[in-house]
Amino acid sequence: MTASSVEQLRKEGNELFKCGDYGGALAAYTQALGLDATPQDQAVLHRNRAACYLKLEDYDKAETEASKAIEKDGGDVKALYRRSQALEKLGRLDQAVLDLQRCVSLEPKNKVFQEALRNIGGQIQEKVRYMSSTDAKVEQMFQILLDPEEKGTEKKQKASQNLVVLAREDAGAEKTLRSNGVQLLQRLLDTGETDLMLAALRTLVGICSEHQSRTVATLSILGTRRVVSILGVESQSVSLAACHLLQVMFDALKEGVKKGFRGKEGAIIVDPARELKVLISNLLDLLTEVGVSGQGRDNALTLLIKAVPRKSLKDPNNSLTLWVIDQGLKKILEVGGSLQDPPGELAVTANSRMSASILLSKLFDDLKCDAERENFHRLCENYIKSWFEGRGLAGKLRAIQTVSCLLQGPCDAGNRALELSGVMEGVIALCASEQEEEQLVAVEALIHAAGKAKRASFITANGVSLLKDLYKRSEKDSIRIRALVGLCKLGSAGGTDFSMKQFAEGSTLKLAKQCRKWLCNDQIDAGTRRWAVEGLAYLTFDADVKEEFVEDAAALKALFQLSRSEERSVLFAVASALVNCTNSYDYEEPDPKMVELAKYAKQHVPEQHPKDKPSFVRARVKKLLAAGVVSAMVYMVKTESPVLTSSCRELLSRIFLALVEEVEDRGTVVAQGGGRALIPLALEGTDVGQTKAAQALAKLTITSNPEMTFPGERIYEVVRPLVSLLHLNCSGLQNFEALMALTNLAGISERLRQKILKEKAVPMIEGYMFEEHEMIRRASTECMCNLAMSKEVQDLFEAEGNDRLKLLVLYSGEDDELLQRAAAGGLAMLTSMRPTLCSRIPQVTTHWLEILQALLLSSNQELQHRGAVVVLNMVEASREIASTLMESEMMEILSVLAKGDHSPVTRAAAACLDKAVEYGLIQPNQDGE
């Protein structure tokens, strides 16, 4: 019974493979392997799994499966050939040629093997020629750089730039490494000349990119400490280049194996985790080193943000995060608690504290259980206590600044720190200080503390008078603006709920007016003006404030200019204000019955502001578009900064979706680069943010020419986000818009259709063809009609044992004219490309003839034409089918249509009758017609 089950599953897998369902075939073969299969059966199953992986383009697994088959049967030529195919794709040509030579020796007359051997031999010769020329080029560059007689720096710079280009190719990278190139590059780094240092760092990027062994060799030669120390130089461009190099090294050590290397690995890495920890340990040490530039410290934080936390919470291993918390949490807090003005021991920038907050937040979010979180809290509290107790006023300032850093990041840890003995009292006391820097630290802490509704209520009761006093009496704008933001934050504690206002009517409008005034004041530095945006981000929950804000052209211009400044920490506040103005947050209309019930139970019911109705929102969106919001957002998306967090990206996605809601606004968004900016938002960020961005992409793809909206290769990047909208967890509208957009893309080129197929969209599109909602059903049928131009989709329709063709025939007879048109178009396409399908149409339903006749008798000329083409294809495919058609009323219908004008319908009908005459089924009349 087991043997028959294995055989049955193998045959089932073979059928699925023939139908193009490679994932299903793979599952069948895997299930068969789990049974008690004989060694011979196991060899066949592994060989078949290799074929599936080749089709799925997973060449590493294809090689593994083929090797397992060869272990069972060394003379299995199919397995040898499949392994050679996988090895060729992996770039291991020398191993691939050995397998092909064995294939040829086993089957000398097999022309496929001979041709494959000739092709791969040509590739090897080409690679040898290229390697030879590359060797010469690398040596030439080295001679110029090493020549002590060469005084001209321009020639040396050109040589070093050529090395950068060569190192991007595998052969050049290998040659550079073998020719003691890393030692030479180290000498370039030691020169201290910016141009030469940049060229050396970029060459090292090429050497290490996606190659674990070369990365380890480079670190071994240069020294991890030396590489990391380059981050701390004063030159911003050199520090950024070093940051890029370290990111490439992290990728090579952490994920390089998964990406598929170019060429063979030249060394075996016993424990890449050790190399990772050494790199991270050096980065943590750099954070607290005196003499390191502020930009370098920010870059180190950025690297830690990207490298340490898990990419997905589904990954069970968070050991690296736990190790960093134990070894480096105090060092991160050291940066978060440092003051920019007056400068302390550690040089920091305006963005350093925000970067530290983001890193702390990501580390905290990466923890899995209460014990791990409790350890995090304990370390933070111990650090704050160590500064707060017994260190005088300077220590208290440092402690409060650290609390602010935590409140901006892992706010749970920040709130617990606020509850430590004396901290809140210290904040209140320092607000009354005569020293500006002390007041700044205290007021900022008070602002961040007001984030929670519970604490906001406490501060409203106890701290509002203090903030008002600071706002009215302070002579320093930097203090007044922060006090104002504190008041703004407390005034917006009710959110969008019109019935919950913390302050008297009109107070929020006065606060907003002052915020706009400061925002427009160019004399105030960007770091201080950022706080005005923070205030507006809170106040724009109020619809009256939104209306005044979008009417203020100068304020909008200042806002967009500030978003382009070096003050990166303003991005979230800008995005928050724009989300509020466009009402692009999620809002569900409450059920009227539930509202009545809540009122009866005397429960609070949120009320919407009258100026938040759709007509007001649409007007605000148009004003923002006219003010240039799209170009500002495009710039924000391009920002390479940890401040552009997943939540910030989500806000930008929400705004874009609101901007493209109206069809007439989409041209403006596309013209200012919005289409290109949406692609990265749809590929990275929170699930909600990616979905919103994908939906905005779908709207643009539906109403504008995709080739103009997404020029060049970008159009292929749009496919994956659109396919993600087909998942069942998306709304019906999102499904519909994705189908419409994919229909447009599928009609452009075969390469785009192949991309859609590769993203496994066809099964989902087929599923929606059975959807009850008529618009979704119609859109999916139209999409399938365009995809039917691809050979793979035609194979699916031609495969035995499925109802795909039947569904199209039945839909061609539906009452929905648009659905009819899509289905009939698909039928016309398929019967033209695959004549064998013509003979199967009469088999799928007994109503086929009625359906075709109804198409030809339709008043819609498009339906008539599609029906006439289907009938013509069937007549040309088989005399037997033609006979059946001519014996029915179809002949009379065709005769009438053939007497019309010179339309496509007339020509198709006449061609049907001519073919019937040729078969001898009918006779031409006396007039020769």
UniProtKB/Swiss-Prot annotation:
Name where it's found: Cytoplasm; Cytoplasm, Perinuclear region; Nucleus
**Which residues are recorded with the post-translational modification N6-acetyllysine?**
K55, K468
Under InterPro entries, the record lists: ARM-like (IPR011989), ARM-type_fold (IPR016024), TPR-like_helical_dom_sf (IPR011990), TPR_rpt (IPR019734), UCS_central_dom (IPR024660)
Show the GO cellular component annotation of the record.
nucleus; perinuclear region of cytoplasm
Which sections of the protein are TPR repeats? 6-39, 43-76, 77-110
Q: One MF term in GO for this entry?
A: Hsp90 protein binding
* Annotated S-S bridges: none
Q: Keywords of this protein's UniProt record, alphabetized?
A: Acetylation, Chaperone, Cytoplasm, Developmental protein, Differentiation, Myogenesis, Nucleus, Repeat, TPR repeat
Q: Name one GO biological process term.
A: chaperone-mediated protein folding
Q: Where are the transmembrane segments?
A: none
Q: What does the function comment of this entry state? A: May act as co-chaperone for HSP90 (Potential). Prevents the stimulation of HSP90AB1 ATPase activity by AHSA1. Positive factor in promoting PGR function in the cell. May be necessary for proper folding of myosin (Potential). Necessary for normal cell proliferation. Necessary for normal myotube formation and myosin accumulation during muscle cell development. May play a role in erythropoiesis in stroma cells in the spleen.
Please describe the quaternary structure of this protein: Interacts with PGR isoforms A and B as well as with NR3C1 in the absence of ligand, and with HSP90AB1. Binding to HSP90AB1 involves 2 UNC45A monomers per HSP90AB1 dimer.
Query: In its UniProt entry, what is this protein called?
Result: Protein unc-45 homolog A
Q: Which gene encodes it?
A: UNC45A
